[in-house]
């Protein structure tokens, strides 16, 4: 909703500068600028917080568009790795006064707002929800998940349901549905030795976590990418372990340099000026 409002704001400003433009040109031009804003925020604010400077150095090591770079989204990134944010979900939804967003007006369990679109359709509730989100503190990425998404996801209390879906299970099965290789396949790709046994995993996680995996999986080659990746200890400067940090940095490097329309490329057709 924030981006919808920003798009409309941009369109209104462009209409002032270019009164002869029609609706379609205003829409598409505002869209181009909005994409540039999203790219800028992602690469200069979000990713540095998630990955740290070492991995950002890898992403930003080149600034020229390269037509030989494949910018498509990898299966591992889409079906597993970038869903690390699911572990950052909290159990409560805060609503705050937009004039003082740090002051919570109301907090309610996340599971209680499933199937209640009034949070976004009611203008007053929408503003309060956005204000609450602006200061809500997320959980750290890791193997611990909020109870609202652990067996209570999309639970519909009004229909008498007592059990919901499990987000972790969904993530595991999504990876299998997509035919993702196991976690062990990605270790050498990210500069680590392939594990021969569960105890070899202690180079990236605690001994207790390795034991937990051995109790669930028959062989270290069976471990799902999402599960082991989210269990890895964060590397220095990053919120994530080496495997997830590696796969995300590779994806973001290719997404940027393989996109001829990326906002910062000098040759991009999306380069902006005041009238654009």
Predicted regions, residues:
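Polyanionic, low-complexity segments and short acidic motifs
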Residues: 1-276
